[in-house]
Swiss-Prot record:
Gene designation: dapF
The protein's name in its UniProt record: Diaminopimelate epimerase
Involved pathway(s): Amino-acid biosynthesis; L-lysine biosynthesis via DAP pathway; DL-2,6-diaminopimelate from LL-2,6-diaminopimelate: step 1/1
Organism (species): Aeromonas hydrophila subsp. hydrophila (strain ATCC 7966 / DSM 30187 / BCRC 13018 / CCUG 14551 / JCM 1027 / KCTC 2358 / NCIMB 9240 / NCTC 8049)
Residues of the signal peptide: none
One cellular-component annotation, GO: cytosol
Keyword Cell membrane: no
Amino acid sequence: MLIDFSKMHGLGNDFMVVDGVTQKVFFSNEVIKKLADRHFGIGFDQLLLVEPPYDPELDFHYRIFNADGSEVEQCGNGARCFARFVRLKGLINRDRIAVSTARGRIVLQLEGENQVTVNMGVPQFEPGKIPFRAQKAEKTYLLRAQEHTVMCGAVSMGNPHCVIEVPSVADAPVATLGPIMERHERFPERVNVGFMEMVNASEIKLRVFERGVGETLACGTGACAAVVVGISQGKLKERVTVTLPGGKLTIAWKGPGQPVYMTGPAEHVFDGQIEL
């Protein structure tokens, strides 16, 4: 079966994007792993699948698969690429796009110069909604992870995040502490691990070890998580520039009960076909 796809990226966080509206597709875990291989496949951090809406009030359903084949609930950089893809492919002729994900609904707004703003929804701090094993919600948690003692924030942006403040992201133990924290026993569905350096109240630097992927050049939900944790701890203002290895995102959050808005680029790289 010959499948059409597009290769896209958001700040270097790269995706294989597939139209599941006009063509019938199915991807097994093994097929996704092979396609994700950067030497023998197409190579990507996540596969994004556009499906018809489950709800008639929405435009599409948005599915995300990590390079290891696991399906996840949300991907912010992917959401921006999703919006640009459906517009480029003529699947919709509006700039405002409402989609469902495995964890809820998000609204995508196409702006000028390949920029997309995404309403990422309301962050969840309640442990049961992250999910995270704790008696009650706290602004910071003290966790033991092998020989490490870690102070972190925990939040869900539709997927679970642990945010660790570090003096310098350049020296952060992403490769060593990242995989340990990803599988920490208090995160029953594993977790994305962010290492955040405070530059000032309006700017942070961030590196993210993504669940099921490893470190990526950018993580949209990770940027949102880091900012809302920083704001909740009284360290950041309502609008923050996040510098990731792949570039910059703007994150805005007005506080508890309010949605998080993420603005950043979505780039189309090439189109292709592959035999499945």
